[in-house]
Amino acid sequence: MIKYNGKIVSETRHGKRGATVTEKERYYLLDSMRGVALLFMIFYHTLWDIINLFGVSADWFTPSLEYMLQRFICMSFIMLSGFCSQIGRHPYKRALILIGASVIIFAVTLIFMPDNLIVFGVLTLLGVCSALILPLEKLLRRIDAYLGFLIFTVLFLSTEWINAGFLGLPGFGFYLPEWLYANHFTAFFGFPHEKFVSADYFSVFPWIFVFIMGYFVYRIFSENKLLRLLKTPRIRPLEWIGRKTLIIYMLHQPVIYGALYLVFLIF
């Protein structure tokens, strides 16, 4: 979901930000991967609207299938964003654009779709993570890339159910005290209160750990001289979609709903 300007950081030993830009190339495969994730998201939201807003029965779309599809989409976007945080320039500008877009979505849903209000959605998360990764990188770069990926994978799995009050792995963990789940401020970090509702909710924890996993994947590619593998293959339709992710993301729901409304009105 992050755009980057096509300029890549040279492959230094540690893959540090700020290394001299030595060539102007684009990792086309990243665009294609974002395009694939976006198409899956459009498919999921179309299916969700058909079932939940237009009342069409779909017994085959089980909760397990829905969960796996949701996880694939969000993990793809967030990890790709963490990876791309090390490509290009102006991370704070990128963060402000994403947070600004999230404010627009909040305002639109508040006015036109209050029953599907979006508070602290994925764009807010990506904006916050994009702003935090630069200061955090000073600490993260000291960690071996493979070890860092493993550590933050475990941290994500251990905090995956923190929104529901549980911390730990299945069969090994504990429930957090209720006083942590106090208000919207705590909800931002991952501790939503009882009356908190959002149609798209991605709190800082646990999802920042997935973003950092993407950062370490970049490190692994950079330190092993593997970034060149992302220049091919060229799949131009997917690349185009991947480069327009933010605007497509912001427009896809009203377009889907409008198209479905016309279809069900006619048929």
Task: Name each region found by the language model.
Residues 2-267:
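Alpha-helical transmembrane segments and their immediate juxtamembrane cytosolic regions
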